[in-house]
């Protein structure tokens, strides 16, 4: 058993070493940006503000789809998606960024399994470019430069009303086969 005094000395030494072990991080205070000092929203992505929010869809099979979009800020907005099955298992997640670049708006998305392992078929991000956009709708199509989009033709987000976000995923038609029906996810604002 250690004497109370030696425990106090050991604790004091350990606490004194924390800033050094943390690479000096603890000695540099973090100051929040001054109010009003935020980067202005790039005009190319400003119309996408209709996507911001928490969105949810309860499916008849007991699964729940959730999508969360941060508001556009600077040149980007970020989104996350998960599908939770009725038994509580999340088979996959998707993380998406939409970024205003020099001459286009790009949507990049990564897909990971529920255990956060990368899907080998989707090791590289899917890359789409904005085809058209209004104040309540945005359509993205595969980029020509390595889109990694598989059989995807287009993705459209729209807001039929303030509390609904509609995601439509359209497959690319295959030659000689009947066109597949688009997938539609009509999500409601959560909270």
Task: Please identify what each model-predicted range represents.
Residues 37, 120-135, 162-191:
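Edge beta-strand at a domain terminus
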Residues 42, 57-145:
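Central antiparallel beta-sheet cores of small beta-barrel/beta-sandwich binding domains
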Residues 10-23:
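Bacterial N-terminal signal peptides
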